[in-house]
Amino acid sequence: MSMLSFLLGEKKKTASVAKERLQIILARERVGGNGGGPDYLPALQKELMAVISKYVDIDVNDIKVHLERQENLEVLEVKIELPDASR
C-alpha cells in the first residue's frame, strides 16, 4: 500500500498543512525575520473577524490581537468584545 501511495502521491491533511505553516511563521519570527514586529498579526485579526462574524454581529474594532515578548517567552493575547446578549 505504501508503494501505491508513493506512486499516486498522498495528499496532506489541511490541519497538518496549517500546522506546518504556523511553525514556519513562528520559527521565522524567533529568528528575527522582521525587526519591527510580527507581520502576520493584521492577517490573523482579519481572519478571526471573518470567522467570528459568521456567528456574531461584531465590529472590526471589537477584536484586538497583541504579541508580547519577554526574554524567552511569547504571549499572544486575543481580546474579543462580544455584544451584549440582552440587546
UniProtKB/Swiss-Prot annotation:
<dbReference type="Pfam" id="PF03776">
    <property type="entry name" value="MinE"/>
</dbReference>
<comment type="function">
    <text>Prevents the cell division inhibition by proteins MinC and MinD at internal division sites while permitting inhibition at polar sites. This ensures cell division at the proper site by restricting the formation of a division septum at the midpoint of the long axis of the cell.</text>
</comment>
<keyword id="KW-0132">Cell division</keyword>
<dbReference type="GO" id="GO:0051301">
    <property type="term" value="P:cell division"/>
</dbReference>
<dbReference type="InterPro" id="IPR036707">
    <property type="entry name" value="MinE_sf"/>
</dbReference>
<comment type="similarity">
    <text>Belongs to the MinE family.</text>
</comment>
<keyword id="KW-0131">Cell cycle</keyword>
<dbReference type="InterPro" id="IPR005527">
    <property type="entry name" value="MinE"/>
</dbReference>
<protein>
    <recommendedName>
        <fullName>Cell division topological specificity factor</fullName>
    </recommendedName>
</protein>
<dbReference type="GO" id="GO:0032955">
    <property type="term" value="P:regulation of division septum assembly"/>
</dbReference>
